[in-house]
Structures are given as C-alpha cells and as structure tokens.
C-alpha cells in the first residue's frame, strides 16, 4: 500500500558563509551561469509539482536574498537560521505541518534534477522511515595517519557519498535532531541525527553531478553540468 504524505516541503539551510570558497560574499550568492547558486537551487525546488512549500533558513544579517528573483514566489517562505546547519533545519521544521515530509537540500547544490527528487519521494514506500540521495564511491579510498601518510586502503564496497535532498517525516526528524543536539552528538546531516536515534535511513542512488559547490574549482564544474543538463 503506497503512502502519501499530507504535505511535502523543502527546507534549504542557507545561513552559512562558505568560508572555504574564499569569496567576499556567502558562496550561495556567487554567480553561476547568469544567476546565483541559490537561485538555481530554488528554481529546481519551486518548480517541482509535488513540493508544496520551500522554506529557506537565512542568516539574520543576510543582505542578498531579498534581491533574488525568486523572493516573491508564492511557495517560498523564510525563517531565521542558526549558527549550525542543524539549527537552521530545525527553524524550518518548526513552521512545517506535523504530518508533512521534509526534503532538506543544501543551498549550494544547484545541479539537482526533478528526476532525482521523484525517485526520493517515491522511496517512501520502500523506506517509510526516510531516505537520502547518495552516490556510490567509485574511487579507491585511503586512510592516513596524523602525518598524512597512508595507513590503509579502505574497502569501498557498500560505501556511499551522502548527497541531498534527505527526506524524512517532519515529526521524527524534528524530534531526533532536537534530542541529538541536546545530547551533544556530532550531527553533520539529517541522516546522522536519525542514525543517532536508532533509525536506519534508506539509500536512493542519485546522480553524481549533484555536487556541492565548496571550493572555487567547483563553480566551473557546476557550470558545465548545468549547461549540459537534460
């Protein structure tokens, strides 16, 4: 029997400053093919027919978001984000319907496709606890010691690169994020909060070009992917 969420929302934590880019402005506002990285991300989410609402968590000192062309879209809402990603996600979850499901997506992943969103949403029937997009590890993985010397080769079997969106019921994600943070757990993404609570999220294989723009070289790569998008 298929499950149909009461509502599907997207949450975009966009309160960070992206210091590793070495740019003068937060990386989500850097230009990419004639509009900002965040604009590309929002365009994909706002245009998806199954997403009812897109909630963006912003830095309280943000002076850039109001200039985006998407700012007046009827499906868009904004909240004040926090210092950490998890705090921003919680801010978005707090204004969501209790029976909704949340797609949490990185602001700096502008190459997301509707096809991957469709696959993730459909996975609720196989993974009623929630799931994430991920890409299988293809390269040989090495672990180093504290001196930067290779100490071992890590078996890549069943290893995945975690991507976003990550898709969970609003009520359980909010509870587990809250509890994990209160316990001082290291939470790097939504799945890690669910794992901490004993939930085993599913994996949905996603496109490897759904990259996160983190370093300057990533901008050129994202530009190429967007130009060749099908």
UniProtKB/Swiss-Prot annotation:
Highest taxon of source: Bacteria
Keywords recorded for this protein, A-Z: Isoprene biosynthesis, Nucleotidyltransferase, Transferase
Top-level enzyme category: transferase
Pfam families: IspD (PF01128)
InterPro entries: IspD, IspD/TarI, IspD/TarI_cytidylyltransf_bact, Nucleotide-diphossugar_trans
Annotated GO MF terms: 2-C-methyl-D-erythritol 4-phosphate cytidylyltransferase activity
Pathway the protein acts in: Isoprenoid biosynthesis; isopentenyl diphosphate biosynthesis via DXP pathway; isopentenyl diphosphate from 1-deoxy-D-xylulose 5-phosphate: step 2/6
Catalytic activity annotation: 2-C-methyl-D-erythritol 4-phosphate + CTP + H(+) = 4-CDP-2-C-methyl-D-erythritol + diphosphate
Record-marked site positions (Transition state stabilizer): 20, 27
Residue(s) at site: Positions MEP for the nucleophilic attack: 156, 212
Keyword Transferase: yes
Chain ranges passing through the membrane: none
GO BP field: isopentenyl diphosphate biosynthetic process, methylerythritol 4-phosphate pathway
Entry EC number(s): 2.7.7.60
PANTHER family, alphabetized: 2-C-METHYL-D-ERYTHRITOL 4-PHOSPHATE CYTIDYLYLTRANSFERASE, CHLOROPLASTIC (PTHR32125:SF4)
Main function: Catalyzes the formation of 4-diphosphocytidyl-2-C-methyl-D-erythritol from CTP and 2-C-methyl-D-erythritol 4-phosphate (MEP).
Family: Belongs to the IspD/TarI cytidylyltransferase family. IspD subfamily.
Name of protein: 2-C-methyl-D-erythritol 4-phosphate cytidylyltransferase
Organism the protein comes from: Shewanella halifaxensis (strain HAW-EB4)
Gene (UniProt): ispD
